[in-house]
Amino acid sequence: MSSQVIAFAVWGNPAYWRLANYKSNGEGVKSFSTLEILSQVEKPKKVILIVSDTLALEAPDKITSYDDVVEKARSYAERYVCSHLDEFEIKVLPGVIRKNKGNAVYVFKADMDDFRSLALYEIYMQSIREDRPLELTLDISHGINYMPTLTYDSFREAAALYSVSRIQRTKIRVYQADPYPILQKETEEKLKRDESSPCTPKSQDAHPPDVAYNLLLEENVYPWEVTRYIGFQKQKVKQTLNDVRNFPEHESIKSLIEELSLPLIGAYRLGAIVQLALLAKPALAAEGASASASGGSINPGQSDSCAPKANWSLKDIEVFLKRSIEEWRKGREPFEDGNEIIVESKNKFAPGFRALLQTHAILSGIKSLISTSELEMVTLTELKNLKKLYQGSKVVTHLLDREIEKLDFLKGKILE
């Protein structure tokens, strides 16, 4: 099956970008952003834009809630897309700014680990929705401050998660355009956006400068690279948020992490494929259970005593990730302090959030390699299949080959 491309791009404020002739391999595209040249070069099935929630301040009216902040930021960015994309989405992540607006001072505060956690979630979840094998690309041309660095870190980690979830080598590419050149003031003015029609320049006879569009990185990411990102603070690994006092799902999440995530991730990192299969089989069997079964869906506030040990499923993980994000968003509501309107997260993502993502990826990969019809039995064929989880590490695959050879030898002796 041939692969397709999903592209991610990080944006600052697009209102002030000027028209350019972006060039790659001799071909040029006139546009206010690199989206058009990215689309031409990569022909992506889908493009996901990552923007900051601080763009909400560009809207004329006052912000009233965090949902309002997200919608204003998304609508503002969408107005400037100006590209013929078959499919695109805009994801709004937490930003940092202090800005005077009217009679108030708006202060946006954010923890950069929250930005990274949400970017990781969005990139990974967008990727696994596709049935066909993917190549992943990232454009950091228009990111500002911390955004390109954090998004690249998350993109790389998400590619590793995607690779293990699909048991494949995943090709990634990263692009960045050259800086926009300094022009004469009159020329620069002509190349600015027309405020009434932001997808056209102020002057139709403007001649935009050539700006090179560069491929910065092209690499293969292998499943084993997930282990680069495994490592948790003991005191926070069993929770997805720092403050769980009013989070009804916390006890169920804690149970899932204790009973499935930590043993599964540990077994994977150690190359303990027998334990890996024994841990995964009940969870994958629960995947096919009815919604009324304990492992099928979790009600808010359900305690860990309601769910039998090891009956957690991929669906449970997805539900808990979504609920953790919803709970985090509830703590980012705007509030007034004197003449300041502050948007600040009262909660933060804890290491357990990343542990759930890693569990989801590893479990998804195992799902394609073993049978769940016989819960108590792990076959030699399944162990040989599980070796595919370790693509990218010659050392681990060599050690597993030796262990499997021993088991094969013992099997032969038993059958003699």
Task: List the model feature ranges, each with a label.
Residues I140-P148:
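Acidic, metal-coordinating catalytic cores used for nucleic-acid/nucleotide bond scission
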Residues M1-E135, L150, R156-E416:
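Long, low-complexity, Lys/Arg-enriched
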